[in-house]
Amino acid sequence: MTKTIVVKIGTSTLTEPETGQLALSTIAALVETLTKLKTSGYQVVLVSSGAVGVGCGRLSRKERPKDIAMKQAIAAVGQGRLIRVYDDLFNTLGQPIAQILLTRRELIDRRSYVNAYNTFAALFELGVIPIVNENDTVAVEELNFGDNDTLSALVANLIEANWLFLLTDVDRLYSADPRLVPTAQPITFVNPSDFAHLQVEAGSGGSGWGTGGMTTKLAAARIATSAGVRMVITHGRQPQNILKILEGEAIGTQFEPQPRTENARKRWIAYGLMPMGKLYLDEGAVKAICQGGKSLLPAGIVRVEGDFVDSEAVLLCDGEGKEVARGLVNYKSTEIDKIKGYRSAQIALLLGYMGEETVIHRDNLVISERKLS
């Protein structure tokens, strides 16, 4: 069976830190590595940051813009140059590429999500390496990915990848930032049971040009491993290490995946959608859902948070506010607020009409990875 690899490279690796100009030697090494993987029989996707950083360099700007409109304009300048460089380098090796620009909107809508999957499948059939970036030019703030670490994990989930490599400016995960704390301990392997107890001073900031930091990489690892994808953090200046890692060398930090048991639709619910609110449940409802595999009934709901409509995604939380599941609701928030705590037989009396007996049917409900661990 053909294996699929997603490789994400960050702005700090793609560009020279002093100037923001493209680090062409690094990009050339990356292109050569990805082409070797493709020739070896892998299906390869590259998630590339850098549009804003390259745009800043092209326009001789010293700082990343904070204004949304300016950021989107500069991304439009940088994306064209970035994809041209990739195309020129891949073309010298005879490897065709495609550009795919995504926003969260494409993953929220089920039909668009399936269309995106089919597009990737067709590109693989054509022998093409897709290059993915967030469509910064049109993404609205509440529907953006926020960083390409998250985007790469969601893409890996979408296409059912086997591996996700995050190429960054450190060689692996450490207990603290090794650039600031010389005694920081390297972490080479993380299994699912250890993930929840991982002690890492991750911080929140990335490089001056990027948007990610180690916090976003750990969030990406949670998405990827929960979806059955093995993830690796390794240094981006040596992309050839990807080949060595695939051959079994202990380079970087590897995150062992959980078994991929959920169907494609449930993975979409779990990772493709943005929760628009929360439902707080009593202990009986939590047990029925998490241990009994039951649907969510109105009687088990204690509190409603957020403003949402039917068919949107929400988080289900226990009495302490911890996420236990997420799913698609059959009622809007104002209706759930009226029927919470009541039996399903009373819905018609409370709302004036009889809708679904369940607030969330079990077919539209996914147990949280945190609750399973």
From Swiss-Prot:
Keywords (A to Z) from UniProt? Amino-acid biosynthesis, ATP-binding, Cytoplasm, Kinase, Nucleotide-binding, Proline biosynthesis, Transferase
Record InterPro entries: AceGlu_kinase-like_sf, Asp/Glu/Uridylate_kinase, G5K_ProB, Glu/AcGlu_kinase, Glu_5kinase, Glu_5kinase/COase_Synthase, Glutamate_5-kinase_CS, PUA
Q: Does the keyword Ribosomal protein apply?
A: no
Positions the record marks as coiled coil are: none
Q: Which residues bind substrate?
A: 49, 136, 148
Entries under CDD domains matching the protein: AAK_G5K_ProB, PUA_G5K
As for what it does, the entry says: Catalyzes the transfer of a phosphate group to glutamate to form L-glutamate 5-phosphate.
What is the protein name stated in its UniProt record? Glutamate 5-kinase
> Taxonomically, what lineage is the organism?
Bacteria, Bacillati, Cyanobacteriota, Cyanophyceae, Oscillatoriophycideae
